[in-house]
């Protein structure tokens, strides 16, 4: 029994192999009509289906099968046996009925997305469809039985019977909820208005001005137009018929100068906007002209002019992508193959008119390069290979070229052989290769790989006496070198050298092998001459529908949250921090730029219907995002300036305003002048990634990120020096935890503000198929406004103080720092007040965990609150062991500080301990002991204070205590921005004791600058 099963399996395998051998594999066939008028059509997976009926009739689907039922239909490679040849999507017919019934024409793509599910994954599939063309008013009854038309294997499914079984097995009949209708939005293309179109239907409209006929546009089930442009294959420009008549007249009259003139006029017409129906018509005119050039002797006189005109027309046709998009894949391959043959035939014919052996004919256009060489004398060739085209010999740029071996030329004629070379750009997109099915290593399964043409189409052939000679089976291979852009091979793998089969309209790898490949060049060795290209597999996978939906949802929700937070931040600064200085001004502009950019993004990123409007939106997005990035750079620069400049400078708002908005405008203008078509893509109103155009935005973004990273590192170093690099008496371990927390919080805020999230966007530019980068960039970038709001409003102590002061001034509550036993006096701030423009003032005061008892004894703690009576200074200094007795200046009060040591000359002694400044209760509390929070100064910066100005007044005599010597006169007012000054303070003066120690003296007539914001 086991032997019988083995024998059966072996026979089955042999039978399948025989079927593959004797049964030709065919692709999509042309529609056929049987005796009853039913139209049958088979379309391979991935190709466009076109169902149509004559005028006055509509489609009525009879049969629909999507799957695989045969080993001989739509199989890209005969060497691969499908793992499943008996699979079908049972929803095919019902889907086709909803999509096509009642329409005169129906367009859709045959793939699993159209039919909602894949009946047999990793297996090439195809669609079999049968339909009738009926009068719209006629009610027709169609069979519900679907079957295949092949004899290899058939599958019969009765959909009505299956539905009845489902109804019988169901205990409860659930109400069917009608799906809400989805429409493709109305738009205007080339002056033609397209109305809102129901999903799953096809809309028709008149052809653009200057053409006649009818154009169609299919709306997908998702409510999106199927293609970028309407299908204008049914349109024809009005000048086509007149040009056809002119050509017929030239040929009949044998007008020698008429052919170049006709081609020149035809080139002028093809420069204008065209419609899809013009493509085969113009191709027919070209082929008709080329036949005359190649076969009629009277046309030889102006061959160079005629060939130049023909190549110019081909160039314009190849560069017009819109007219190619109106045709399905098979038609595009056919038209592309005919263009190649027409160019070759015209140039080969010109070889007859070349009078001397040294003459050559070269025509170069942006999309086409063709050349006929002079007659090659092998006896004078020193090498085994001859390089073509001639531009590859003298042009310093990288030019696609062909190295033809001596062996190939000797096979023809060693002294009379000519070489034809051709190179076509933009043509590979129309000659797309079929998906290849390969076996998965180590398993019995197969997978389908998508491939893409990544090179130009390069051709070479040998000519003898004006006729092309076939060359194959060479012992020395032909070496073809392709140069391509690095961006064109990104995310691609597995390069394959192939040649074009004009009969089968497909790429073939036989006879060619890969010699060398890198990011910019590929070299192939082939044993024959024809037209060659390089194919590569698409690596990775596109975002599926779930990922796309989730990313879209995250983007919209995140952007809405970000916009709200940015506007809240903007108004918080505008209301509560009006006198905040340049930093607040930068924050306001940053928030405003980002908010406008994200509002524009939400409102216009998908408005691709109108190309002009889409381009304007892309320009606005680029400018606003560049402006936001520039303000981020200015923020980093300003923070660094605040921490490094000794003296506060004048406000720079006007300078910041120019830098924040003018350079982004210049970059955007240069990008627009370089390539205005780069603004707006078929999918989004953003910058195109073609030809590296996206780097007009990504380049400045990279620069700003790198610059801000340097600023961040430098700023953190400066902050670290201020917090832990001061003098030993000024450092307090009890405050190290708070200092570190503030340092980390500030670093995170700065890192967020300086655009760290944009690095994920740059990674995504490099790997656009990375789902991880897509999610990370979408979430982090869309929530950037939330980060700014949290770090600069919610968690910002300065903002909380500003809000408290704002409420206190309006009588909404006490100051944020007030208490029943501790009242402080508000001091009117000016431009030099703490927290405004100071770089070293009150920002360097911080509270401690030290607690002190206060009483009437001021010897141990020298305090000041602006209203207290001061003790006799002589008695104070007599009791303090670290101070000598001397007479003070009128109206001043000694304030102890650290010794500067070497900064002032004199004898160095131990400095007194650092003094804490304490708040004092009102007089009514008497001498009750109160416990208050202590405060320390930040350590002074590590630089010498500036020298005092020369005194202009008469010197005051000083009477120091006994035993003093080497006394110095007191210095004048300290620098307004020195280590212990807060910008506008005039209270403090310095005094040098007889021992060389420096103390600060407080002028009691000045306002109490250090009693605020503690």
Swiss-Prot record:
Question: Where are the residues of the annotated region GPS?
Answer: 497-542
| GO MF annotations, alphabetized | carbohydrate binding; endopeptidase activity; G protein-coupled receptor activity; transmembrane signaling receptor activity
Matching entries from InterPro entries are given as:
7tmB2_latrophilin-like, GAIN_B, GAIN_dom_N, GAIN_dom_sf, GPCR_2-like_7TM, GPCR_2_extracell_dom_sf, GPCR_2_extracellular_dom, GPCR_2_secretin-like
- Tell me where in this chain the SUEL-type lectin domain is found: 43-134
Please list the residue ranges that the record marks as compositionally biased, kind Low complexity.
Answer: 965-986
Q: Mostly located where?
A: membrane
Q: Glycosylation: which residues?
A: 4, 473, 518
Extracellular face of the membrane: 28-555, 606-613, 675-692, 767-770
Q: Where is this region: Disordered?
A: 814-833, 932-994
Which SUPFAM superfamilies does the annotation name? Hormone receptor domain
| Transmembrane regions listed in the UniProt entry | 556-576, 585-605, 614-634, 654-674, 693-713, 746-766, 771-791
Has UniProt tagged this entry with the keyword Ribosomal protein? no
Q: Which residues form the GAIN-B domain?
A: 359-542
Disulfide bonds, paired cysteine numbers: 497-524, 512-526
The protein's location, in the record's own words, is: Cell membrane
What the entry lists under PROSITE patterns is as follows: G_PROTEIN_RECEP_F2_3, G_PROTEIN_RECEP_F2_4, GAIN_B, SUEL_LECTIN
> Does the record carry Amino-acid biosynthesis as a key word?
no
Family annotation (CDD domains): 7tmB2_latrophilin-like_invertebrate, Gal_Rha_Lectin_LAT1
Which Pfam family name is an example for this entry? HRM
- Which residues, if any, are the signal sequence? 1-27
Family assignment from sequence similarity: Belongs to the G-protein coupled receptor 2 family. LN-TM7 subfamily.
Quote the subunit structure annotation: Monomer and homodimer.
Domain comment text?
A: The GPS region of the GAIN-B domain is required for signaling.
Protein name, UniProt field: Latrophilin-like protein 1
Source organism (scientific name) = Caenorhabditis elegans
Whichever gene encodes this chain, its name is lat-1
